[in-house]
A protein has these predicted regions:
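Hot-dog-fold acyl-thioester-processing enzymes
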Residues: 1-57, 112-113
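HotDog/MaoC-like acyl-thioester-processing domains
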Residues: 2-4, 37, 67-68, 78-113
Length: 113
């Protein structure tokens, strides 16, 4: 598992300071890219080799709201890998109290240009 930390920005929230749900998918992507980078995989190298892996499925289960200025931990783990696909799971946790804010998963499939 790879984890990175970030802080909720004002632009990611609504008028009440609650994070808009779409931001969790961006955070999942940040975790996935960090996981790949830690494994020695750079996305631009794959793209230069005409290897692409679009997301064909993504889901999120929201547990508790993230709020403006919360420090969060984004955790990503690869759970399956084959020549055809790779699956990841994610957890978003508020650092100050350890509250699970969201969890999710995604699937990428491999193809070429």
């Amino acid at each position: 598992m790879v984890s990175i930390c970030d802080r909720v920005r004002y632009v990611e929230t609504d008028m009440m300071g609650v994070v808009h749900h779409s931001n969790y998918f961006r955070w999942f992507e940040m975790g996935r890219v960090a996981w790949l980078r830690a494994a020695g995989v750079e996305l631009w190298e794959l793209m230069n080799a005409n290897i692409i892996f679009p997301i064909t499925h993504v889901e999120a289960n929201y547990k508790e709201s993230a709020l403006y200025d919360d420090e969060i931990e984004i955790c990503a783990e690869m759970t399956a890998f084959s020549r055809a696909k790779m699956d990841f799971t994610y957890r978003i946790v508020r650092k100050k109290d350890g509250a699970l804010l969201a969890e999710g998963c995604s699937r990428n499939v491999f193809t070429d240009n």
